[in-house]
Amino acid sequence: MTLLDETASAQFGDDVAPTEEWAAEVRRLARQRGATLLAHNYQLPAIQDVADHVGDSLALSRIAAEAPEDTIVFCGVHFMAETAKILSPDKTVLIPDARAGCSLADSITADQLREWKAEYPGAVVVSYVNTTAAVKAETDICCTSSNAVDVVASIPADREVLFCPDQFLGAHVRRVTGRTNMQIWAGECHVHAGINGDELADQARAHPDAELFVHPECGCATSALYLAGEGAFPADRVKILSTGGMLDAARESRASQVLVATEVGMLHQLRRAAPEIDFQAVNDRASCRYMKMITPAALLRCLTYGTDEVDVDHETARLARRSVQRMIEIGQPGGGE
């Protein structure tokens, strides 16, 4: 811990309560710093509520690029703040705690991707946006969970595809496209991978009238489709959706109850979008400890001291930006990750 960290910790403590006074001070400091506050859907409810914008990582990064403010405070994990910096190279991008990593993004490095590419010369590399800037720089086309199928389908059928890093999203894309020349990296989000098929089946049986919203990063996504295919659960009530897709579906749903298979922070936005629906987590322990490192105290420290700043070197950012722009040219990324 640096002297600055020690000073900030002594001033704010690590157990700052998200009171109305705290929220007012956060907004005052943001105005003073000329900053816009962005919060990912998986953040603590108090962080979501105080933010100027809440959403998935790519949508927030695009908002950051269009925002009039010169400083962006990204309440999310590190690769998300990197993506904001890639799309807003002239802006100051801050993350309240630079230690907030991501098990999925960390499951492949740029060196590992280069070695993989060498095994399949001529292959097209498709990387999920949940990757580091260095991996994006080695990527041909990025994708989100909502447009991954369209991105892969846009690639000529005779070209090999290397899909990374999420094995469950990759399996979903391969299943939908029917593509046989598609290699999939064996990475995973530890939170989504932990939402298993047995839990999903038990919840579905216990709530036979509910709809199922399942994120494609989940280890249980295949189980959800199996339940529908076997008639154990009505197919029209099983939806494989990105976080943005979940919000759209919630606003249109006529169900009285929805079972949600993703990180539990998403429930806050779903309940705000459709307060008349009873949203329940398939696994109420599916909480990302990295996301929850962005605490009320960390946000106060960030706004007070201007820490932690995120930087991406010019060449890495240029190459990474190219892969993101190619994705956008293929089609709107829609509901994001």
Swiss-Prot record:
Top-level enzyme category: transferase
Catalytic activity: iminosuccinate + dihydroxyacetone phosphate = quinolinate + phosphate + 2 H2O + H(+)
EC number: 2.5.1.72
GO molecular function: 4 iron, 4 sulfur cluster binding; metal ion binding; quinolinate synthetase A activity
Binding-site positions, iminosuccinate: H40, S57, Y128, V129, N130, S145, H215, P216, E217, T243
This protein's UniProt keywords: 4Fe-4S, Cytoplasm, Iron, Iron-sulfur, Metal-binding, Pyridine nucleotide biosynthesis, Transferase
Gene3D superfamilies: NadA-like
GO biological process: 'de novo' NAD biosynthetic process from L-aspartate
Coiled coil (residue ranges): none
Localization of this protein: Cytoplasm
InterPro entries in the cross-refs: NadA, NadA_sf, Quinolinate_synth_type2
Predominant place of localization: cytoplasm
Database matches in NCBIfam families: nadA, PRK09375.1-2, PRK09375.1-4
Protein name, entry field: Quinolinate synthase
Species, as recorded: Mycobacterium sp. (strain KMS)
Gene for this chain: nadA
